[in-house]
């Protein structure tokens, strides 16, 4: 896996042949297209995740494209949202989770992160991300 932030065309080109997963945001995806002349879907990678901020995430795999909507929240500070998403997604994939499950929890974590001011100190715990969006228990 490789997260292309900050984007450096030569660095990305150098690692592409060794990747099975590339994670980048929409701006970086456009920069990569400009640098290589190809869209991210034409790079021959097994998996590409493109984060789209409040619009969610795009997963490219085996010539297909899946879009995942992001949870709707009131953003306070978007610093670290992409890092939160990437960290959660990679940790879950490393556990053997399937991509849709990894993306779903990573998006919950990133959505929670942006509701708080700060960077690393505002990243939610996994249990908190897992509970996010659940209906409260009846009391």
Q: Which ranges hold each PLM region?
A:
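Conserved beta-alpha-beta core of the PfkB/ribokinase-like small-molecule kinase fold
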Residues: 1-39, 55-57
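Conserved phosphate-binding/catalytic region of the ribokinase-like
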Residues: 36-139
């Amino acid at each position: 896996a490789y997260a292309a932030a900050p984007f450096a065309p030569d660095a990305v080109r150098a690692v592409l042949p060794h990747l099975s997963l590339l994670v980048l945001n929409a701006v970086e995806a456009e920069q990569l297209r400009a640098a290589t002349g190809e869209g991210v879907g034409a790079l021959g990678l097994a998996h590409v995740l493109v984060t789209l901020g409040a619009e969610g995430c795009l997963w490219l795999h085996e010539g297909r494209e899946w879009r995942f909507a992001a949870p709707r929240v009131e953003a306070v500070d978007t610093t670290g949202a992409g890092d939160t998403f990437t960290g959660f997604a990679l940790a879950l994939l490393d556990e053997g989770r399937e991509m849709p499950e990894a993306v779903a929890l990573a998006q919950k974590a990133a959505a929670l992160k942006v509701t708080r001011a700060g960077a690393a100190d505002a990243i939610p715990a996994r249990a908190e991300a897992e509970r996010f969006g659940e209906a409260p228990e009846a009391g």
